[in-house]
């Protein structure tokens, strides 16, 4: 179509050129008009072609799919299930696993094993709530560690929000603390003897003085 239009414009141009020599002035005017019309037609044809090409532009590729969050490991899931079982028994919502807290506890337990002879860490000034367990003579699974903390439930008196007698129950109240929503835990086997050190962190921390856990 573009070639045909160009040829037609050239024929008009030649016809005007061989017109009467006495009308050179008229010829000159017509010649300019013809060139102008041809130029306008060329612009329209080019614009039409560009519009056609633009309409066929290939759309951008779709964004790459986002990867799903990595599920907790088997040990992490065992820690989580044992905690949430105890929380559900008193009507408290479940905790979620925090890779950040898990990393913090892993670094701490490794340090306590390598530098502190597998002793308890000082958690009194930490920004998270914390529970610890040291056990020897057997392999301690995550569920066994949590169950030993939950066993302190029998010492907790909800009515007056205190532990009975001289017994301790703070590790249990931290487990069921309603405002704590994230959990991270780690375990290490001690070098001397069959012993295991377990640490769990809770965020936000629980056991706030004057408040009930739930």
From Swiss-Prot:
Keywords: Repeat, Signal. Gene3D superfamilies: CAP (3.40.33.10). SMART domains: SCP (SM00198). Highly expressed in the stigma and stylar cortex throughout pistil development. Not expressed in other organs. InterPro entries: CAP_dom, CAP_sf, CRISP-related. It comes from the Eukaryota. Residues 13-18 are annotated as: 3 X 2 AA tandem repeats of Y-I. Residues 80-200 form the SCP domain. Sequence repeats lie at residues 13-14, 15-16, 17-18. Residues 1-19 form the signal peptide. GO terms for cellular component: extracellular space. SUPFAM superfamilies: PR-1-like (SSF55797). The keyword Repeat applies. Pfam families: CAP. GO terms for biological process: sexual reproduction. Belongs to the CRISP family. May protect the outer tissues of the pistil from pathogen attack. This is STS14 protein. It comes from Solanum tuberosum (Potato). The gene is STS14.
């Amino acid at each position: 179509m573009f070639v045909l239009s160009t040829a037609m414009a050239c024929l008009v141009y030649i016809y005007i050129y061989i017109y009467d020599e006495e009308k050179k002035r008229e010829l000159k005017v017509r010649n300019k008009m013809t060139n102008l019309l041809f130029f306008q037609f060329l612009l329209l044809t080019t614009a039409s072609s560009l519009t056609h090409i633009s309409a066929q532009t290939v759309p951008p590729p779709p964004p790459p799919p986002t990867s799903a969050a990595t599920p907790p490991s088997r040990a992490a899931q065992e820690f989580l299930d044992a905690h949430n079982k105890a929380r559900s028994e008193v009507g408290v919502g479940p905790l979620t696993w925090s890779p950040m807290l898990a990393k913090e506890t892993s670094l701490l337990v490794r340090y306590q094993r390598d530098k502190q002879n597998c002793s308890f860490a000082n958690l009194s000034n930490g920004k998270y709530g914390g529970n610890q367990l040291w056990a020897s003579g057997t392999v301690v699974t995550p569920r066994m560690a949590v169950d030993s903390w939950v066993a302190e439930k029998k010492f907790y008196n909800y009515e007056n929000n205190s532990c009975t007698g001289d017994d301790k129950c703070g590790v249990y109240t931290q487990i069921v603390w309603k405002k704590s929503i994230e959990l991270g835990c780690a375990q290490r086997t001690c070098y001397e003897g069959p012993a295991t050190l377990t640490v769990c962190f809770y965020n936000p921390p629980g056991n706030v003085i004057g408040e009930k856990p739930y």
